[in-house]
Amino acid sequence: MNKSIRLRLIVMNIIQWAAWGAYLTSMGSYLASVGLGARIGIFYAMQGIVSIFMPTLMGIVADKFIPAQKLLGICHGISGVAMTAAAFYGMTAGTDVAFAPLFAMYALSVAFYMPTIALSNSVAYRILENNGFDTVKVFPPIRVFGTVGFICAMLFVNFMKDGAGVQFQNSYNQFFTSGVISLAMLVYCFTLPACPCTATSGENESLAERFGLKAFSLFKDKNMAIFFIFSMLLGVALQITNGFANPYISHFKVVDEFATSWGAENANALISISQVSETLGILLIPIAMKLFGIKRVMLIAMFAWVLRFGLFGAGNPGPGVWMLIISMIVYGVAFDFFNISGSLYVNMRTSGKIQNSAQGLFMLMTNGIGATIGTLSAQAVVNKFTHTVDTAAGNFLVGDWNTVWYIFAGYALVVAVLFMILFKEPKNMNEKIA
């Protein structure tokens, strides 16, 4: 039974993250190729905007009204249909893609995909706890397979080509891939073990309790408030490389020295090293949490972001490719030691009644407010130092990319130093705040 439960959750994580991996790191190149390079940040910011309210809202629904595993499937179904519609529009529009219709369908898709990140974590935690597992020890190895799914989807769209020889990573076909995977998740979720709504309604409940807003009471605890604020500040960094790493590496195609390099031609495959590193990073989390505690683990993540951005600025697909590779390797620690450890920390500090809502709140601060500010600010920086060049090979963003990445590295360094000074680690990690 124990092996069966783990296997079910492994499959869930593979599908969950493959749906995102199909386009997350390559969408920027497609947008640039159809003349929407100056609006890449808006597309990625939309993921943050919907994360401001949708994860919290869906967390409340899962706590109060619809079992979490069924709600997870419903969200994937809506997301998959909308993403498939976006792909169909891209196919019919060709090179005459208009911003409004593509963005509208994409926005609807991510509005229902983003809450599934927190929901899938909640479903896994609940099923593991119901079967007597220690989530801190058992969940990270399961979550590793989510990254495996993400990598497989990335590599699929990198190497798969359409009839005209265009890689999926540079076309609307990445959206088709994501849509089909999400629809598969819809079916799979309805076969998962039940995760009943845990919150009870009663006449004595306050309005905040009835609508699941009690998770915001976590801000009454000074340390948790600081934790959530810095989650937002570090969340600024999360989507920057997702949105701009592929256009950055691909732009070397129009730089004579690097035009024929393997990295410039296969940006998504090069970036996939980041996800391989993420897989290994997840396995280190239980050990790191035990040895260092949440503060040091998050500090490691913050300084890893400094290296991630700084090495991007110094590297290239030629003699400097080793710096790009190290940057990809560092990403595993930068992402996992913040996202996964932070989610586990929230789970340990909250009771079952509001855990879904608390995970939604964490998602709001990181992938919501933080990522929105980050992607819009990053787009402004990119627009300041780069410009679009139309070539026979397509549209590319060229300019002073080095300065762009050094600015991002400087920001991450400031956040790390402030967190080191202000955050105090709790003496009892398992003491419930709410």
Q: What are these model-derived regions, one by one?
A:
Residues M1-I52, N223-A259, N266-A267, N339:
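Helix-loop boundary and gating motifs at the non-cytosolic
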Residues M1-K3, P193-I229, V254-A259:
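Juxtamembrane intracellular "pre-TM" segments in multi-pass secondary transporters
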Residues I14, H76-M83, T95-L119, V123, ...:
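Hydrophobic core of transmembrane alpha-helices in multi-pass small-molecule transporters
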Residues I42-D63, A269-L284:
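Central cavity-lining transmembrane alpha-helices of secondary-active solute carriers
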Residues L57, A85-M91, I181-A194, G368, ...:
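Multi-pass alpha-helical transporter architecture, strongest
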Residues G77-D96, F303-P317:
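C-terminal ends and interior cores of transmembrane alpha-helices
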Residues F159-V180, A380-A412:
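A membrane-interface helix-boundary motif in multi-pass transporters
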Residues R296-G342:
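C-terminal transmembrane helical hairpin of 12-TM major facilitator-type secondary transporters
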